């Protein structure tokens, strides 16, 4: 709702948002604080803004409540302080953050029980049942989720390069942060990525209603916005603060210490080595953080050992980045990046013959061409050759015997 993506939910995925619209209209009046962001080429009509604002407010309040329940249910996340609803003084209309009381920009919350602020009202619970059913029964959405499970991963090693979205969580000194995943069991670096990948799939594939499904489902939320999550890479997400607190000092989302070290080549090499990427051309291909190209920021970090290619295709970030994202190319000659200019509008494209314009530049030119034997395909072929040679050797040594009857039939 905030980014005007209702068409995607309703038309593409067939999810009925009428129950949310009806509920928000009946329960909320003025909701201008939750007005959706206006995109220049898609101006809203006044009545749309009012309805979308109410819908945004209604689902946001439900989200704040459910997040409060989750962080207490999963204390191992260490995020009880993100139960924002329980920190509000409902009588005074303020919230205490780090010892300071901040006034809320909106104090009209008719569905909140001050003595139990994370509890859903009966109507909210019924609405969530309807929405969950709609999401679960959307064939296209479920097909996309299955595709993510079968083809996706939390990280990817390809031809000596390491691709991941967020970060490898690190401590202040640059060492890998350790996460407790069981009694006396801690994981860090690649081992934690593997654990997180398995738990995320568990949230989508474990039997419905099982403890494993519930644990994995909660962990999917943690991956999205959890403290030092390898996908999120920040201390917390300030959704509540941005919506309801005027003071922008509370909007900060402190980044993990990983981002303090990405300009150091040795740090990047340490990560590559820990994931088994030790080719001369090996690089980290990172996402998540918008590159402010219009301010001269480079997508290359750590003397070229890390490449950031995120932050542009989302229109909400294009005002910050000045571009519409990057595309990376890697072939036998080296690596190139293409920086794309934002797509203005269909009208402009037709009238002026403008399309998405791209500018390419070299990241690295290799001193010698990469051969098939140097990449993943070559390693797979070599592995098959090695297996066949072992079979041949076993045959010549008499370990494998030929069935003469079958040999004659052939």
Residue ranges and their predicted role:
Residues 1-410:
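Feature recognizes metal-dependent phosphohydrolase scaffolds
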């Amino acid at each position: 709702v905030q980014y005007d993506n209702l068409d995607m939910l309703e038309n593409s995925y067939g999810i009925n948002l009428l129950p949310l619209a009806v509920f928000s209209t009946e329960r909320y009046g003025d909701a201008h604080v939750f007005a959706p962001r206006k995109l220049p080429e898609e101006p809203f009509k006044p009545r749309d803004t009012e309805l979308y604002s109410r819908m945004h407010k209604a689902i946001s309040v439900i989200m704040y409540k459910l997040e409060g329940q989750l962080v207490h249910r999963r204390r191992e996340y260490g995020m009880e302080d993100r139960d924002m609803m329980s920190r509000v003084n409902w009588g005074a209309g303020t919230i205490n953050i780090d010892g300071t009381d901040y006034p809320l920009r909106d104090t009209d919350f008719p569905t909140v029980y001050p003595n139990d602020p994370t509890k859903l009202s009966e109507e909210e619970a019924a609405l969530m049942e309807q929405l969950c059913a709609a999401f679960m029964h959307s064939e296209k959405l479920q097909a996309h989720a299955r595709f993510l499970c079968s083809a996706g991963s939390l990280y990817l090693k390809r031809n000596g390069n390491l691709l991941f979205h967020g970060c490898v969580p690190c401590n202040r000194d640059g060492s890998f942060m350790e996460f407790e995943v069981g009694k006396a069991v801690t994981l860090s670096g690649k081992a934690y990525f593997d654990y997180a990948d398995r738990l995320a799939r568990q949230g989508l594939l474990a039997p419905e209603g099982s403890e494993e499904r519930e644990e994995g489902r909660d962990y999917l939320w943690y991956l999205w916005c959890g403290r030092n999550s390898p996908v999120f890479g920040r201390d917390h997400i300030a959704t509540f603060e941005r919506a309801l607190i005027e003071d922008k000092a509370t909007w900060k989302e402190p980044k993990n210490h990983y981002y303090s070290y990405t300009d150091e080549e040795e740090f990047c090499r340490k990560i590559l080595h820990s994931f088994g990427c030790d080719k001369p051309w090996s690089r980290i291909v990172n996402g998540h953080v918008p590159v402010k190209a219009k301010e001269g920021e480079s997508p290359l970090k750590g003397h070229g050992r890390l490449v950031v290619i995120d932050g542009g295709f989302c229109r909400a970030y294009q005002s910050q980045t000045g571009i519409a994202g990057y595309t990376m190319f890697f072939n036998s000659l080296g690596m190139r990046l293409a920086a794309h200019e934002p797509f203005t509008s269909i009208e402009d494209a037709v009238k002026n013959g403008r399309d998405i314009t791209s500018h390419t530049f070299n990241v690295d030119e290799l001193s010698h061409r990469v051969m098939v034997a140097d990449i993943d395909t070559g390693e797979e072929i070599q592995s098959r050759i090695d297996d066949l040679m072992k079979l041949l050797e076993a045959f010549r040594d008499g370990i494998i015997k030929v069935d003469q009857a079958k040999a004659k039939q052939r």
